[in-house]
């Protein structure tokens, strides 16, 4: 969650309150698939709930994508969230964000609030097709973010290993309603480019363990949030239960907890 949306350690205070109710043991630095395996958890506990989110990000599919100055929006938002002082963070002067979801909006607005001179959010389709809510789109523009629709990234420009700009091709829909490039190119200067074109389930989380059924890049669950593995439930962004929003993840957790209770009582 972007730092400007939840101030004063709101989420941490919520966690602290719940943990203090008692009967909860917290183990940190235990990465699923590395320090701890799903198969081992299934042997040790009657029920396992996976709320692992989507830890990987989609690639732009461009050459030199590993250039300095080309970052994952999700990773950057996480770093900002954990930073003790946002005032000490450096931010680029000219920033281009690629994507049309709430994550793209978050990093664009956050960059502007941190002092970036020029922030442009780009999306390959129109505003109606953006997964970001209309409220979020309007908020970005009132925050000083420029939004450019109907452009798709084609190539990155660099100097001495650092991104200096990005080439876009204008897009349109063909008579069948499919997206296509028009051949018209546009160049945008940038010293920072953020990728926000969707997240993926991280394969390594199931390393060395039986893998639950996965469809469309997400863990498959039934109406009770049960996975294909006995004794394993899942919820949040890692399953397709609705919108990829915090409130949806919280609701998934509540419903899964009730399901686990019914199964074990």
Stretches with model-predicted labels:
Residues 12-63, 155-167, 192-194, 199-202:
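Feature captures the FAD/FMN-dependent oxidoreductase FAD-binding
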Residues 29, 50-52, 73, 98-100, ...:
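Generic beta-strand/beta-sheet core signal
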Residues 91-125, 178-181, 186-192, 225, ...:
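Long hydrophobic segments that form regular secondary structure
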Residues 66-92, 176-243:
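FAD-site-proximal beta/loop scaffold in flavoenzymes
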Residues 60-64, 108-110, 133-134, 205-209, ...:
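Short amphipathic alpha-helical segments
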Residues 7, 16-31, 57-114, 214-228:
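Glycine-rich dinucleotide-binding loop and its adjacent helix/turn
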Residues 1-17, 26-28, 108-155:
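Rossmann-like dinucleotide-binding cores of NAD(P)H-dependent redox enzymes
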Residues 107, 238-265:
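A conserved FAD-binding loop/helix module that cradles the flavin
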């Amino acid at each position: 969650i972007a730092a400007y949306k939840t101030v004063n350690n709101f989420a941490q205070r919520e966690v602290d309150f719940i943990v203090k109710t008692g009967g909860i043991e917290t183990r940190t630095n235990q990465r699923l698939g590395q320090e701890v395996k799903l198969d081992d958890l299934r042997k040790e506990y009657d029920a396992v709930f996976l709320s692992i989110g989507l830890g990987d990000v989609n690639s732009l599919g461009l050459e030199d994508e590993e250039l300095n100055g080309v970052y994952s929006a999700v990773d950057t938002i996480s770093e900002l969230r954990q930073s003790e002082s946002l005032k000490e963070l450096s931010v680029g002067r000219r920033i281009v964000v690629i994507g049309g979801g709430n994550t793209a909006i978050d990093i664009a607005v956050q960059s502007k609030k941190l002092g970036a001179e020029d922030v442009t959010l780009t999306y390959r389709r129109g505003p109606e097709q953006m997964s970001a809510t209309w409220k979020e789109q309007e908020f970005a523009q009132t925050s000083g973010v420029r939004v450019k629709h109907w452009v798709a990234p084609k190539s990155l420009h660099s100097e001495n290993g650092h991104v200096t700009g990005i080439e876009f091709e204008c897009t349109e829909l063909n008579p069948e309603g499919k997206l296509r490039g028009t051949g018209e190119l546009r160049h945008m200067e940038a010293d920072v480019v953020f990728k926000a074109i969707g997240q993926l389930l991280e394969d390594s989380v199931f390393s060395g363990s039986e893998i639950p059924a996965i469809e469309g890049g997400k863990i498959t669950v039934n109406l009770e949030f049960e996975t294909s593995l006995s004794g394993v439930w899942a919820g949040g962004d890692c399953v397709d239960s609705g919108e990829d929003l915090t409130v949806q993840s919280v609701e998934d957790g509540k419903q899964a907890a009730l399901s686990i209770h019914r199964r074990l009582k």
